[in-house]
């Protein structure tokens, strides 16, 4: 809470306790990542939790600021609500509290934006953020199926489109990362206050904000006193894949073809017969079903479930009945790992009797961390402590210590032995607790035992610490990865059963021989059934196109699902998706080329076009409409001899990432220009820290990233090639100076050529660097221990003579092409038109993130699609600002020789200390001779 809030406590009769704790809370700025909810909660652990509820109407006593488009009005069938249309800005309400105490906060809201994902907000009390997590609040946007599951002309199921669930929803503000299952508690003194919501990704209608305290649920034994089942025997089975609504667009029906008992099932035809799997694993996600009973009374609940994804770990859910948790045991329901389908009875060996009302009732299963909450919190603390120790060690030894030197680490670092012993004990206690909860001793948690053994060795032989610092960093990364795994809570559901008798909760099994017959039919059907030929309902179509993709299986599966579910019903054209790593030149020459190829690297289209292997695209009727979806520069890499031969699919570029905690400790500010960066390099190197300027791929020491050279060149106002595209500008004064600057980073400043930026950034020995902007999502998913301790920013620029900063950055991308041998070029173009539009790119990105997490966040070339992915409003603004300053390198005949010789020149200067000017001029002569030869070969001159 803020200093002003502490003052309010003193002047409104607040207790001495309130004044002391508020003052303590203000020892630091609570909005940064060092002030977590765990510390805030401990500070107010003894505070009262009054049973009164304070209601703040959305339409009253509010002030909109910072550009927020907010006004009182009517929406969604309700009057007197706040309608906040913009994604950014802030809205502040004034309200009175009757007494001191700790309160939870819940909102009754309506998502206004049909295209958006979750709503993201920040909360301030009296103008201050009470703790870091309050700046990253998430309210889910709910969806439901537009129709029931239908069938195509071949009898295969068509998955229904997921559309927004346009109803008012009440949701408490709480953790969405898996560290806590309870709503946040906010301490307030009696008297006047303000509550501010800041829009990270708003677009929300707010009916009311409530400050409340939920009564603790009673135990099941108390809840069920005198409980009896309803009078008449009753059993009804519900298909889990047909819920009322769910908290994510990607919680749609999926399929299982492994069991004859899955309902419904078919050995040959595709049936969307389950819901969940890995899509239903993120903390706070939920699915709501409607069940109906003939009379008031108590009923048993069962479900056919499977948790076969997180090996050796459990998944947890919280059960709500008609909006509330019925009893304490329902707050954390454990589903154990098993490769087989299970008939789960709620309550286990002593089934629960749950009160339902006559008519419709709502059942909700929410993803929680359950018994693992404490384990997750302790793992996070352990990783943080290990990384702090690692950073202290390398500030003494450097990242590459002399293994024959005794650095006396145990004496140089204060309380070294005690700290290491505490970490070792913590590792052991976390491991023991995880195993006691049913997790596998030899599975994922074995990473903890490795860390403990290493730490114990440090105590016994501190002289060996320097030779093991890379191992320490690696083990810390392993624990962080374990934490991510533990937070994932996948579950798949087939059916939900409501019954007055426990015997009817089990699925009627068709036995071993039934399954054998089912699998035999499925095997035989695989030879005759054309699963790729999915038509548009009853409409007959013979139009088919072959689409090759050079991605992983997960990406191809998502693409296939979208093609079958959206493109084919819309156009009547079937797209057969194949994962192919074959050379396109070979395919073209062999006459076996597909119609469309997706995710082609940006260097290939011109290379294929000059050999006659691609179809020029400018002549298609919607070409101008399609290309208007992208940045103006995005087509530059696909222009050859006056025509365009590809359409952008994805595009990425670098942003700057820096550790705010380390910068603060060293009194540094993020660099605006490269001159600022040089100063930062010197300060960091004085502390045995370094900077990450991309050069070599972390998995390939021989690779060199020439994008930094291109970035520096364009920032100076130069271009890669001359205007006639017949030669480079490398031997110009600007080109030579840029080459010299580029090589100086590694030759003179000693920056590392090869490094793992994720590991070194999270450990802190590389607290600043450049990386693709999707590194943001990777940090969010895989490095939760440093959440709030880093920021993303624009890359350093070059200041011109007028004082303006040029932040040009080299972008890279993939594209879609139509092969020259396509038999239906119009159908192929329709597919490219569809896959690059806003809806398709948004859906593809959303589904990939749901499947693989934020570390695999898609980088669409479609500008509008970016706003439909899981970026906050401020993040979108930042990325778009850098995107507008990006450029794509043109491709010319002989492009391959440009990079090859530029890399050779770089190596000769950096590794052999050659003269930069002489070297780049000599290699540039070779480049220009090859360009001239290629132009003659393809009759361009």
Language-model-detected regions and their locations in the chain:
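Long, aromatic- and glycine/proline-rich binding clefts that accommodate carbohydrate-like moieties
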Residues: 793-797, 846-904, 908, 936-941
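Glycine-centered hinge/linker elements that transmit conformational signals in sensory
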Residues: 724-754
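Periplasmic solute-binding protein
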Residues: 609-612, 631-672, 689, 696-725, ...
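Conserved N-terminal structural module of periplasmic/extracytoplasmic solute-binding proteins
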Residues: 386-606, 917-941
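Extracytoplasmic/periplasmic substrate-recognition and gating elements
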Residues: 99, 295, 783-856, 884-891
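Extracytoplasmic
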Residues: 19-499, 811
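Extracytoplasmic "Venus flytrap"/periplasmic binding protein-like
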Residues: 565-633, 637, 661-672, 765-768, ...
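Hinge/lid segment of periplasmic solute-binding proteins
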Residues: 523-541, 602-655, 678, 705, ...
């Amino acid at each position: 809470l803020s200093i002003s809030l502490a003052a309010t406590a003193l002047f409104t009769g607040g207790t001495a306790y309130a004044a002391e704790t508020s003052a303590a809370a203000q020892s630091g700025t609570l909005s940064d990542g060092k002030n977590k909810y765990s510390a805030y909660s401990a500070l107010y652990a003894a505070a009262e939790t009054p049973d009164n509820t304070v209601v703040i109407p959305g339409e009253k006593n509010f002030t909109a600021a910072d550009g927020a488009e907010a006004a009182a009005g009517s929406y969604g069938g309700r009057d007197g609500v706040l309608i906040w249309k913009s994604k950014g800005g802030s809205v502040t309400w004034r309200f009175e509290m009757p007494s001191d105490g700790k309160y939870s906060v819940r909102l009754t809201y309506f998502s206004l934006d049909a295209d958006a994902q979750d709503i993201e907000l920040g909360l301030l009390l009296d103008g201050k953020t009470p703790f870091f997590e309050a700046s990253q609040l998430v309210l889910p946007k709910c969806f439901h199926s537009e129709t029931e599951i239908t069938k195509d002309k071949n009898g295969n199921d068509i998955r229904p489109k997921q559309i927004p669930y346009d109803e008012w929803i009440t949701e408490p503000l709480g953790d969405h990362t898996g560290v806590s299952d309870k709503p946040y508690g906010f301490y307030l003194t009696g008297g006047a206050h303000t509550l501010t919501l800041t829009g990270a990704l708003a677009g929300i209608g707010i009916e009311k904000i409530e400050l409340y305290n939920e009564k603790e649920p009673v135990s099941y034994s108390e809840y069920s006193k005198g409980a009896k089942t309803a009078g008449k025997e009753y059993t009804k089975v519900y298909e889990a894949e047909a819920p009322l609504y769910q908290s994510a667009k990607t919680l749609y029906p999926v399929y299982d073809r492994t069991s004859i008992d899955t309902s419904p099932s078919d050995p040959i035809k595709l049936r969307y017969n389950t819901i969940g799997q890995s899509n239903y694993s993120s903390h706070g996600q939920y699915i709501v079903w409607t069940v109906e009973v003939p009379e008031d009374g108590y009923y048993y609940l069962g479900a056919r479930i499977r948790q076969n994804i997180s090996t050796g770990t459990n998944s947890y859910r919280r059960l709500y009945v008609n909006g509330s948790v019925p009893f304490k045991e329902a707050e954390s329901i454990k589903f154990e790992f098993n490769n087989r389908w299970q008939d789960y009875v709620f309550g286990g060996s002593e089934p629960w009797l749950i009160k339902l009302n006559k008519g419709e009732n709502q059942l909700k299963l929410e993803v929680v961390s359950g018994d693992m909450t404490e384990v997750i919190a302790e793992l996070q603390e352990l990783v943080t402590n290990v990384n702090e120790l690692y950073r202290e060690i390398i500030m003494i030894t450097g990242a590459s210590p002399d293994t024959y030197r005794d650095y006396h680490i145990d004496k140089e670092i204060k309380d070294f032995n005690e700290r290491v012993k505490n970490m070792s004990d913590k590792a052991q206690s976390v491991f023991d607790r995880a195993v006691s909860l049913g997790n596998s001793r030899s599975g994922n948690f074995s990473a903890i035992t490795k860390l403990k053994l290493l730490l114990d060795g440090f105590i016994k032989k501190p002289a060996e610490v320097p030779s093991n610092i890379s191992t320490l960093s690696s083990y810390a990364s392993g624990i962080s990865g374990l934490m991510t795994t533990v937070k994932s809570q996948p579950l798949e559901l087939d059916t939900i059963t409501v019954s007055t008798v426990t015997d009817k909760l089990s699925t009627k099994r068709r036995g071993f021989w039934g399954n054998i017959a089912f699998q035999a039919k499925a095997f035989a059907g695989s030879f005759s059934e054309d699963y790729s030929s999915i038509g548009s309902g009853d409409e007959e179509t013979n139009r088919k196109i072959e689409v090759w993709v050079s991605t992983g299986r997960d990406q191809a599966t998502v693409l296939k699902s979208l093609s079958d579910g959206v493109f084919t019903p819309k156009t009547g054209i079937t797209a057969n998706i194949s994962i192919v790593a074959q050379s396109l030149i070979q395919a073209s020459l062999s006459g076996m080329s597909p119609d469309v190829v997706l995710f082609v690297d940006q260097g290939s289209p011109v290379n294929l076009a000059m050999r006659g292997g691609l179809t020029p695209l400018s002549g298609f009727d919607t070409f101008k409409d399609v290309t208007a979806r992208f940045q103006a520069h995005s087509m530059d890499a696909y222009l050859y001899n006056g025509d365009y031969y590809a359409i952008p699919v994805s595009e990425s570029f670098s942003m700057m990432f820096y550790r705010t905690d380390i910068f603060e400790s060293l009194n540094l500010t993020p660099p605006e220009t490269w001159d600022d960066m040089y100063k930062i390099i010197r300060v960091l190197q004085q502390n045995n820290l370094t900077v990450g300027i991309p050069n070599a791929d972390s998995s390939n020491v021989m690779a060199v990233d020439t994008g930094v050279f291109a970035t520096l060149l364009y920032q100076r106002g130069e271009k890669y090639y001359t205007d006639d595209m017949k030669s480079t500008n490398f031997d110009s004064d600007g080109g030579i100076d840029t080459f010299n600057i580029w090589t100086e980073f590694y030759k003179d400043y000693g920056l590392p050529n090869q490094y793992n930026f994720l590991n070194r950034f999270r450990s802190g020995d590389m607290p600043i660097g450049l990386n693709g902007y999707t590194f943001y999502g990777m940090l969010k998913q895989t490095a939760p221990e440093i959440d709030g301790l880093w920021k993303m920013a624009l890359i350093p620029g070059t200041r011109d003579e007028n004082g303006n900063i040029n932040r040009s950055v080299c972008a890279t991308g993939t594209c879609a092409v139509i092969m020259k041998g396509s038999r239906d070029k119009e159908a192929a173009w329709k597919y490219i038109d569809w896959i690059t539009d806003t809806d398709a790119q948004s859906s593809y990105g959303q589904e990939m993130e749901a499947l693989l997490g934020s570390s695999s966040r898609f980088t669409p070339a479609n500008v509008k699609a970016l706003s439909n992915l899981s970026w906050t409003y401020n993040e979108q603004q930042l990325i778009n600002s850098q995107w507008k300053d990006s450029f794509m390198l043109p491709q010319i005949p002989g492009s391959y020789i440009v990079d090859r010789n530029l890399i050779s020149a770089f190596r000769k200067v950096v590794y052999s200390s050659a003269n930069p000017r002489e070297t780049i001029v000599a290699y540039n002569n070779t480049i220009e001779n090859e360009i001239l030869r290629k132009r003659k070969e393809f009759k361009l001159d």
